[in-house]
């Protein structure tokens, strides 16, 4: 079983916490992580691109000249694609880029990035993040006590609203509830700060 140091908010060590190897001791699978990140980034795309085809262009309902007898090429509409200001052929239309990967694949990807954080010594366990009021200054002090000064993902338990509010406007800090953890945010962070209760909720959901 893997164990990491458990810290208090003031930065002093409060013993060790044992991690479940079924969640934090998995051999990282880069291919699965790549697929999961690709899926998440695809679902983030707006997909609102659009062009006007000949039916969406204004005008063009009348045949510009008669079919025969003029010596000119036959035309049916001034909004045909070959005309200036005509419609676009096979242009992009609004669509969703999102797709789903199997649940087992997503779970393995999440376990892989969590396990990689442990291997990189980038996981910081805190016994709790308790604040009297949701003050950003107090949250920054805790991060300084933990020697965390890089891009950080903080995982808190579901009912810790004050911690979620205290750090939400820090530029290099993202705070998520334990149930909202995802592959992209974990992989994109340099440090992963997790409370004791959030660890328990993670292991309960993924083990």
Swiss-Prot record:
Positions of the UniProt region annotated as Disordered: 45-78
UniProt xrefs under InterPro entries: Ribosomal_uL4, Ribosomal_uL4-like, Ribosomal_uL4_dom_sf
Basic residues bias: start-end ranges: 51-71
Pfam families according to UniProt: Ribosomal_L4 (PF00573)
Top-level division of the source organism's lineage: Bacteria
Keyword Ribosomal protein among UniProt keywords: yes
Protein's name in the database: Large ribosomal subunit protein uL4
Originating organism: Lactiplantibacillus plantarum (strain ATCC BAA-793 / NCIMB 8826 / WCFS1)
Organism lineage: Bacteria, Bacillati, Bacillota, Bacilli, Lactobacillales
Name of the gene this protein is made from: rplD
